[in-house]
Regions:
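A cross-family "folded-core" feature that marks the main globular domain of proteins
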Residues: 1-93
Length: 93
């Protein structure tokens, strides 16, 4: 429920609407991500990136605000490379 609420908030903050497939894909990915973070099963090779665009910075700010309740509830911090994955996923949708 918290993940779907956060996705809804993110859409509102960005002023866009994701289609059902995108929402479902984000829900599954973020739910699995949270499970990995809670169990402290991180990926062995975290993806390195150098994204400094203003568009990504804006997305990152909105993402962190939208998912702050999720991070607080599960006591996790969603890593920047995961935010970048979601950013790329949404851009391709």
């Amino acid at each position: 429920e918290r993940v779907s609420d956060a996705i809804y908030i993110l859409q509102n903050d960005l002023g866009i609407s994701f289609d059902n497939n995108t929402c479902f894909g984000l829900y599954v990915h973020i739910s699995c991500l949270i499970e990995r973070l809670v169990k402290q099963n991180t990926l062995e090779d975290e993806i390195y990136f150098n994204e400094t665009s203003e568009e990504f910075q804006k997305f990152q700010t909105h993402f962190k605000q939208s998912f702050s309740v999720v991070e607080h509830y599960y006591s996790v911090d969603i890593p920047i490379h995961e935010v970048k994955y979601v950013y790329d996923y949404v851009k391709r949708a």
